[in-house]
């Protein structure tokens, strides 16, 4: 007989069931707040395990990234094809204060833009904002028919594509390097850069559907709580200090 564990002895009683614990009873709910650059500040709720022992709930929340439709943040269905990434940087009570972490297009929108009989032009540029955020911007554009054009196709020549791509990189570099991350976000929402590119390249070849299709955050500067609170409109710092009244003054004895 082989020496080993006796399975019959180790078995428990058949009628006893294990006590099930609801995992949500150990979790807390936190509100996710978007920066003040967006119209709708309340993004939603997120769950996290309660602070117990050395495990802190705040540490688990910091660094979380949420992907939200820009249509929900701006309360406008015209922005439904764009997704914004928000990263949790600070916890204030039961609120998670987020910052802009990136932007992207939905796959179905990108697929719908690509059509026959036109040239697709793409460009990307790596740029640093005035508040030291390193970003990579990706632009996309398509050629369109000139006024009174009879020919079906609108293919641009290689020299024209190179000239358009150069203009695209120059405009993206100029617009992003001259402002902070919050100011760049306000430019990205109404697609100011896309319209600027369309206007600048009119003399080379007419373009349509010019978009900044993606913004990728490569590197962030050292975390600044004051800047984040200003971004959320919750800064309480004043230029002047408040006078402190002394209620009790200690008497100094001349001789002991």
UniProtKB/Swiss-Prot annotation:
Protein's cellular compartments: Cytoplasm
Stretch list, region Disordered: 1-20
PANTHER family per UniProt: 40S RIBOSOMAL PROTEIN S3A
Comp. bias (Basic residues): 1-18
Positions of modified residues (N-acetylalanine): 2
Keyword entries, A-Z: Acetylation, Cytoplasm, Ribonucleoprotein, Ribosomal protein
One GO BP annotation of this record: translation
Keyword presence, Ribosomal protein: yes
Protein name: Small ribosomal subunit protein eS1
